[in-house]
Swiss-Prot record:
Pathway: Polyol metabolism; glycerol degradation via glycerol kinase pathway; sn-glycerol 3-phosphate from glycerol: step 1/1. The modification Phosphohistidine is found at H232. This is Glycerol kinase. It comes from Streptococcus pneumoniae (strain ATCC 700669 / Spain 23F-1). Key enzyme in the regulation of glycerol uptake and metabolism. Catalyzes the phosphorylation of glycerol to yield sn-glycerol 3-phosphate. The lineage of its organism: Bacteria, Bacillati, Bacillota, Bacilli, Lactobacillales. Belongs to the FGGY kinase family. The gene is glpK. CDD domains: FGGY_EcGK_like (cd07786).
């Protein structure tokens, strides 16, 4: 093995941690993955053990080295990308978390979010953070931990505790406590950060009674945050020089550098992000305004629509209903369905995300007849993912007065050709599937490599990630609109069913 240099991306996700080593062409040299425990203390609560996450990251770093034969001193820089919003509070001295990490999906702080809404803070939070008040974001999770762990508020006020999203936790661990930092994209998801003024918002901190002393320093997405402590990186002292929340990292990995460019990642959930350039644009239709990335002294904003259930609907077909043995099989069954698409599945298992934001909604099925088959049901579940994406793309076009010409896609479910073709049909636009579907990790690697000169500039990156396949719409307009009208009716009925009885 020659002394070629590489970039390592650490991709810390909701169900597993991965380390991927990339070469100068942006190609994957090796990767390692490790799942970790999902903790469900009560219905609707989701937690992780932050130490177990750290151990899984250590394990995959080793795995990537072993698989490739690359040595720690051949890693030029490390990029980190992470599940966003998930919240850790730990002891500054011992480095031990004082409670489990509360995961982005967890609804345990929903009563706190409702309280803030009822107190009339909706507009204020939206204008400052670009977000809607929801248990999804970190703010109420921090408040919950400080409320439920004995003495935590007092210790936080004394400066004995630290808060971080997963990126912050990993950098703190990798540098052995030398760096307590986060980046623009992760800070923007806490509901504590003023995305216009680019600073922690004192008024929001006061409303929530969260001491400023526990917050990390906010930095750009591409700069050196610190170096690995040799005993945490198998002898290597390597700069950690790129960082972004998973969806923003995918935006960067998809090379969506121009305003108006849009990407969708079909993962557990589905996250559609549009680069809106250097102007912050507040949505009037329940999309989130967030920071895409900050690089070279400039900050690029984004509009985002979050769908909570996408790929996990296919997992539900596999694990919950046992209709398929593996996810790819869903494509075959969908093609074998010969009904007229009259079945609609609304997979609101954890409520409805953008643009509805109805946390009481639950999954429902419409249009069943005696003739409905397993194939029809599977097809309707795949189609539900595409319909939800259309909800958001339509909203984005209204908000920005921009006609979206092409949707760049990545993520596991983007491998499903039936879903991609139906997505093109129901949107009426081209779907460009990335050749390298590792766009999230690649985005983190690009950010890290740029800041140490491994790649020269954005123009060099543009040569690296080509489109793999283009799906063009082939459905006629009236059929498309008829199907989508049925979906809107199904969502409306789902929301009526979810209405809380007086």
């Amino acid at each position: 093995m020659s002394q070629e240099k590489y970039i390592m991306a650490i991709d810390q996700g909701t169900t597993s941690s991965r380390a991927i080593i990339f070469n100068k062409k942006g190609e994957k040299v090796s990767s390692s993955q490790k799942e970790f425990t999902q903790i469900f203390p009560q219905a609707g609560w989701v937690e992780h053990n932050a130490n177990e996450i750290w151990n899984s990251v250590q394990s995959v770093i080793a795995g990537a080295f072993i698989e490739s034969g690359v040595k720690p001193n051949q890693i030029e820089a490390i990029g980190i990308t992470n599940q966003r919003e998930t919240t850790v509070v730990w002891d500054k001295k011992t480095g031990l978390p004082i409670y489990n990490a509360i995961v982005w999906q967890s609804r345990q702080t929903a009563p706190l979010a409702e309280q803030l809404k009822n107190q009339g803070y909706v507009e204020k939070f939206h204008e400052k953070t670009g977000l809607i008040i929801d248990a999804y974001f970190s703010a109420t999770k921090v408040r919950w931990i400080l409320d439920h762990v004995e003495g935590a508020q007092e210790r936080a006020e004394k400066g004995e505790l630290l808060f971080g999203t997963i990126d912050t936790w990993l950098v703190w661990k990798l540098t052995d406590g030398a760096a307590h930092v986060t980046d623009y994209s992760n800070a923007a998801r806490t509901m504590l950060y003023n995305i216009k003024e680019l600073k922690w918002d004192d008024e929001i901190l006061e409303i929530l009674n969260i001491p400023k002393a526990i917050l990390p320093e906010v930095r750009s997405n591409s700069e050196i945050y610190g170096k690995t402590a040799p005993f945490h990186f198998y002898g290597g002292e390597v700069p950690i020089s790129g960082m972004a929340g998973d969806q923003q990292a995918a935006l960067f990995g998809q090379l969506a550098f121009e305003p108006g460019m849009v990407k969708n990642t079909y993962g557990t959930g589905s996250f559609i992000i549009m680069n809106t350039g250097e102007e912050m644009q507040l949505s009037e239709n329940n999309l989130l305004t967030t920071i895409g990335y900050g690089i070279n002294g400039k900050v690029y904003y984004a509009l985002e629509g979050s769908i909570f259930i996408a790929g996990s609907a296919i997992q539900w077909l596999r694990d919950g209903l046992r209709m398929v043995e593996n996810s790819p099989e869903s494509e075959k069954y969908a093609r074998d369905s010969h009904n007229n698409d009259e079945v609609y599945v609304v997979p609101a298992f954890t409520g409805l995300g953008a643009p509805y934001w109805n946390q009481n909604a639950r999954g429902s099925v419409f249009g069943l007849t005696r003739g409905t088959s397993k194939e029809d049901f599977i097809k309707a579940t795949l189609q539900s993912i595409a319909y939800q994406v259309r909800d958001i793309i339509d909203t984005m076009q209204v908000d920005t007065q921009t006609a979206i010409q092409v949707l760049k896609v990545d993520g596991g479910a983007a491998m499903n050709n039936f879903l991609m073709q139906f997505q093109a049909d129901i949107l009426g636009i081209d779907i460009a599937r990335a050749k390298n579907l590792e766009t999230t990790a690649l985005g983190a690697a690009f950010l890290a490599g740029l800041s140490v000169g491994y790649w020269k500039d954005l123009d060099e990156l543009k040569l690296l990630n080509e489109t793999g396949e283009l799906f063009e719409p082939s459905m006629n307009e009236s059929r498309k609109e008829q199907l989508y009208k049925g979906w809107k009716k199904a969502v409306k009925a789902t929301q009526v069913f979810a209405e809380v009885d007086d």
